[in-house]
Each structure stands twice: as structure tokens, then as C-alpha cells.
């Protein structure tokens, strides 16, 4: 049997059920051709308002792009939105009170947008309504936001958050993998869904309190293989408390991966958790 909490999955059934890392070369060629042909054969249409999109093949109009709420004042560790009037928390190297008290297992989170209208419409469409075409648009959006920030030291691999088998059977796909495929095309970083897997089905995290989320996800992941990489990015659609990606990062760190980033399209604000009083510079010690 596989060992939980960082062990390798060892049963034949688990091995055969594992997700594949590399897509066939033909699929990559077809995807690339379709992506280029779409902008030539069809006018891009905004996925939100139906107006004219932006060339080439970007399905959002400038007006709807402007309506997206950016996560510009956030903790530099977990990307939790902070209250206050500072325009850019990253320039001030602020960490939230939760990260000061209990640093996450990952090194930093990149969540360029807030989980709010109209972006939540696109994410819910991908996640719950089978609109996998939204993954291409979301990947383009994400790549636009972070490309310059990772230019000097991009991660070597993208690792999507594994979906519980029950939810995978219900949906027929993993939205984190769909988003990861788009990021792989946009940023030329390999997507590897065969590095880590869930060892058991967990309850839906939605609706659970922070402590309950940590208990629910504890020891729910195990390594399928040890990648030849020292810097990776975990990919997901939305971060709420960060419990899932934090548990994944714990297992990946135990496997020897030195630097772990978390990439998500959006960060859901946790009302009342972080205020100006809990936002402190990274080099400031917590008062005893």
C-alpha cells in the first residue's frame, strides 16, 4: 500500500490510475494550430459581455478586463488580501498576521486577481459548468499578469492540485489540469500531473472553517514520483484559506523540492482575518 503524507504510491491500481504527465505530441500540435486558426477564422468574442474581444484570440474585451478586480494589496507570502490604502503590498514586503504566526510551507503565492465578479463567473463556468474553453482564457490572463515577474527565475514544473476521484468522475476533468495546460502553452513550462496524487477522497472544502479544512486535507496527498526539479509551482483555480496547497507543499518539501510557489487565478478574501494591524513588514518580529 502507498504511504500517506509523503510516501510513494506503490499499488498497481494506483499506478495505473495515475494522471499522465506529457500529452501526445500530436495533441500539442493540434492545440497550437487551433489556437492560431481561431484568431484568423473567427473574431474573438468577449466571454463575459459578448462584445468584440482582442486580437489575437483573446476572448475578453478591454472593458471587461478593466472590470477585473486585481489583488494588488496582499500578503507577499500567501496573497491574502489586506485592508488598507497602500497601492502595492509587494513593494512594501508585508506579511499577514496568519503568516507571521504560522508561516506556510510554500515560499510564496501568486494570485493576481480577487475572487469576485466578473472573474468568478469565468472560474465557476470552468469548474462547475463544463466550460473547459474558459481555461485557455484564464491561462492567457494569468500569463499576462505574471510573465515579467518570473522572467528571471521561472519554476521548472507546474504541478496541478489533484482532484478527488469522486469529483473527477462527476465532472469528467480536473479544472486545475485544464488551467495548467493553458499555462504550459503560454509560458512554455512543463505541466506534470503525475508527481503527486490524492490518497483518499476528502470532503468538499467549501463551507468548512479554516481549522476544519486543515484537518480534512491532512495526509491526503502522496508522491507518485520524485521529479528532477528544485523549483515548482502548484496550480489551482482559487485559493481560499490555502489549506490544500499548504498540505501539498508539505509533501513536496519532504520529497526534496527546495522552492515551491502557488499559482492561482484568484484569492478569496477571508473577511475579518487580516487588517492593517496584522500586516507587518517581513523583517518585523511578532510581539511576544
Language model features by range: what are they?
Residues 2-236, 240-288:
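Glycine-rich phosphate/pyrophosphate-handling loop used in enzymes and phosphotransfer proteins
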Amino acid at each position: 500500500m502507498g504511504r500517506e503524507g509523503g510516501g510513494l504510491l506503490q499499488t498497481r491500481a494506483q499506478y495505473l490510475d495515475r494522471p499522465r504527465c506529457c500529452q501526445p505530441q500530436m495533441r500539442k500540435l493540434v492545440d497550437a494550430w487551433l489556437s492560431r486558426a481561431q484568431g484568423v477564422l473567427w473574431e474573438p468574442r468577449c466571454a463575459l459581455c459578448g462584445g468584440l474581444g482582442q486580437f489575437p484570440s483573446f476572448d475578453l474585451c478591454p472593458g471587461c478586463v478593466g472590470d477585473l478586480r486585481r489583488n494588488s494589496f496582499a500578503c507577499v507570502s500567501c496573497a491574502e488580501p489586506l485592508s488598507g490604502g497602500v497601492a502595492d503590498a509587494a513593494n512594501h514586503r508585508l506579511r499577514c498576521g496568519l503568516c507571521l504566526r504560522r508561516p506556510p510551507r510554500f515560499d510564496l503565492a501568486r494570485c493576481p486577481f480577487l475572487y469576485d465578479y466578473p472573474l468568478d463567473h469565468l472560474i465557476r463556468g470552468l469548474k462547475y459548468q463544463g466550460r473547459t474553453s474558459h481555461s485557455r482564457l484564464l491561462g492567457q490572463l494569468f500569463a499576462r499578469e505574471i510573465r515579467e515577474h518570473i522572467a528571471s527565475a521561472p519554476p521548472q514544473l507546474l504541478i496541478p492540485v489533484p482532484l478527488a476521484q469522486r469529483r473527477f468522475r462527476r465532472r469528467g476533468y480536473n479544472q486545475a489540469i485544464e488551467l495548467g495546460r493553458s499555462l504550459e502553452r503560454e509560458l512554455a513550462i512543463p505541466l506534470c500531473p503525475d508527481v503527486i496524487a490524492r490518497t483518499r477522497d476528502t470532503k468538499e472544502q467549501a463551507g468548512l472553517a479554516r481549522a476544519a479544512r486543515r484537518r480534512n486535507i491532512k495526509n491526503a496527498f502522496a508522491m507518485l514520483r520524485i521529479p528532477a526539479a528544485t523549483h515548482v509551482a502548484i496550480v489551482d483555480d482559487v485559493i481560499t484559506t490555502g489549506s490544500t496547497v499548504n498540505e501539498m507543499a508539505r509533501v513536496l518539501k519532504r520529497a526534496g523540492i527546495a522552492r515551491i510557489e502557488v499559482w492561482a487565478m484568484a484569492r478569496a478574501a477571508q473577511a475579518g482575518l487580516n487588517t492593517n494591524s496584522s500586516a507587518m513588514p517581513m523583517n518585523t518580529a511578532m510581539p511576544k
